[in-house]
Curated annotation (Swiss-Prot):
Gene Ontology cellular component annotations, sorted alphabetically: cytoplasm
Ranges of residues in domain Lon N-terminal: 22-215
GO molecular function: ATP binding; ATP hydrolysis activity; ATP-dependent peptidase activity; sequence-specific DNA binding; serine-type endopeptidase activity
Protein's name according to its UniProt entry: Lon protease
Disulphide bond pairs: none
Role according to the record: ATP-dependent serine protease that mediates the selective degradation of mutant and abnormal proteins as well as certain short-lived regulatory proteins. Required for cellular homeostasis and for survival from DNA damage and developmental changes induced by stress. Degrades polypeptides processively to yield small peptide fragments that are 5 to 10 amino acids long. Binds to DNA in a double-stranded, site-specific manner.
Source taxonomy: Bacteria, Pseudomonadati, Pseudomonadota, Alphaproteobacteria, Hyphomicrobiales
Record InterPro entries: AAA+_ATPase, ATPase_AAA_core, Lon_bac, Lon_bac/euk-typ, Lon_lid, Lon_proteolytic, Lon_Prtase, Lon_prtase_N
Record text on subunit structure and interactions: Homohexamer. Organized in a ring with a central cavity.
Annotated gene: lon
Induction cue: By heat shock.
Residues in Lon proteolytic domain copies: 602-783
E.C. number: 3.4.21.53
GO BP field: cellular response to heat; protein quality control for misfolded or incompletely synthesized proteins
Amino acid sequence: MTGIEQKTPVGGSETGGADGLYAVLPLRDIVVFPHMIVPLFVGREKSIRALEEVMGVDKQILLATQKNAADDDPAPDAIYEIGTIANVLQLLKLPDGTVKVLVEGTARAKISKFTDREDYHEAYAAALQEPEEDAVEIEALARSVVSDFENYVKLNKKISPEVVGAASQIDDYSKLADTVASHLAIKIPEKQEMLSVLSVRERLEKALSFMEAEISVLQVEKRIRSRVKRQMEKTQREYYLNEQMKAIQKELGDSEDGRDEVAEIEERITKTKLSKEAREKALAELKKLRSMSPMSAEATVVRNYLDWLLSIPWGKKSKVKQDLNFAQEVLDAEHFGLGKVKERIVGYLAVQARSTKIKGPILCLVGPPGVGKTSLARSIAKATGREYVRMSLGGVRDEAEIRGHRRTYIGSMPGKVIQSMKKAKKSNPLFLLDEIDKMGQDFRGDPSSAMLEVLDPEQNATFMDHYLEVEYDLSNVMFVTTANTMNIPGPLLDRMEIIRIAGYTEDEKLEIAKRHLLPKAIKDHALQPKEFSVTEDALRNVIRHYTREAGVRSLEREVMTLARKAVTEILKTKKKSVKITDKNLSDYLGVEKFRFGQIDGEDQVGVVTGLAWTEVGGELLTIEGVMMPGKGRMTVTGNLRDVMKESISAAASYVRSRAIDFGIEPPLFDKRDIHVHVPEGATPKDGPSAGIAMVTAIVSVLTGIPVRKDIAMTGEVTLRGRVLPIGGLKEKLLAALRGGIKKVLIPEENAKDLAEIPDNVKNNLEIVPVSRVGEVLKHTLVRQPEPIEWTEQENPTAVPPVEDEAGASLAH
């Protein structure tokens, strides 16, 4: 690099002449003063290049402290403008790539501007001159500084006593001020302030001020250390420790109003309605506490235990409201629909009004996300007048989260059940256990097994927490749990009363949007009702084309989007109001996300609409089948699991056994391959409920008869052609209604479940119970297949086909 050779000589700038050009070394967490010799460890590439450049041409370098030590590549404005010109005495490269350099500060300098050099920092700077001052005043200050510095070093053990001797021999008072400043334990900005001061008198005054402040702090620290040391020597003597505690209380002014801690705990034990076992345990622990030193670690453990034992509610009950009309009003006002849950709650209150011995029910609300399970629990608490506490079980894997840690462990505490009871402050709250199906288990135990005791009405009256070690009565607690699926261990499931919340119909969603979601959006976005309105047709359009869910969470997000864009439009265009209609809806929400109506526009061969149940509600399931020349292979695709594959095999075997009744020549099976595909290919699918849909698809493919586009179906099929019942009927019917299906075929054994289906679903769908495959094909195929006569030519004594239970409806 030849640019360094063109630098202005440093000598001119030391005398206050024109600016010189210097390589700049930014420093972290250190300020180098003139006359100091300091070792530095340099690791940044720019800094190493600057040092190599200076060493190569034997020039001086400018040391400037950066404002933020964490900044790896500081900008010019992130470096203090006052620095120190220094000579590089020695440079040593270390094995790890860093450099150790020994520098000696010579003079203060002020940076005027940085150059645009990229390989290292470079700047123009001029050495600064010290002003002429009164020598007598400076000498007096210097003597005070040396005296205070001697006291400072005596108190601060980190500084070598030899430094005091060296400082007292310095005749140059400027050098004395800088030497003292470099050894002070003050912050970097304060040291930089000392460097920036040119006046020797001001520097000595600042050094004196900083030292006096530090000496005061160090003296207090010394007194504290001495006092602690004396106290430690007396720890074995209880009398003196107690006297010391009294002395401390007197110093704090608490002696008059303060109360004896043991007496206070004893009074709390007397006033609290503890059980007999808990009272005996509390008194035993109190007796133990009396004999302990108050400062011992064990005393702290006992105090914490007694505090927990006395803080949880013992026999403190909320007055449960028994007004059935009030409860019904609260539940109806905050949640639309959900009649079965409301009926169960009101029924419990009715029985409780007649009998005080009834135990709290343990309800499990099972349903897809967004149907209001968690918020319903809060409404139940309000309707019954109970305190509300919530405990989320999602991801809980440690049994100690439920039962607590034993007191042998440091930092142990009760489990979340007891902690929540303390938070409730009453012994009969409504306790929500959220996401109970999301609990896991690992080497630390199985929390679902620990929940068995909590949720068993026969056992939870004597719930034992590992920390408390006494029985606690949970029988008055009303437990409500929520889950998305029934994926809950059997013994735990058996202890709960399952209430399914299948999801909302379109009309229910519309009412929820009008009663709850729109007013909430208006309130949350600081709108006035007259400023923002959405027509009923627009809301219905949002439900149909922008959401596809069992709950209303996505619907709420879309309504919030409308409100947010309405606020933006009002502020931008100064409109007085925004009205969302069916016509301008797409301007606010964009293109439609979902298609509402039938999946296919025409009747097609081999294309059948089935119905599926998922964790988020029901879905339409398209099943496609094609036939091609081959060797009789059956191919299934669409990420199907074992049960569904077996269902397809059973359907294919059934069709093959009844081939002549469907007008299919048996040799055709050996000459054709059939491929059944279930979109979407990336989504795993399982279950037997698509059996009759598979039979319909295979028969349609082999006969060439199209399937009606407006029919959906669900039901398991047997090898004898019977249609078996399925689960999740309500969710599947809601999915059919959302998809614009006109007719739904369900198993005859599920007809009894129609009583729980909302009337508007039954009124808008033609629901046909079927018990045989023959009945299914009558409804699903555009025309019925004609049976054929067929005999085995190679085997004249062919066994006549066995007529199955569906034969009567198909043959002849």
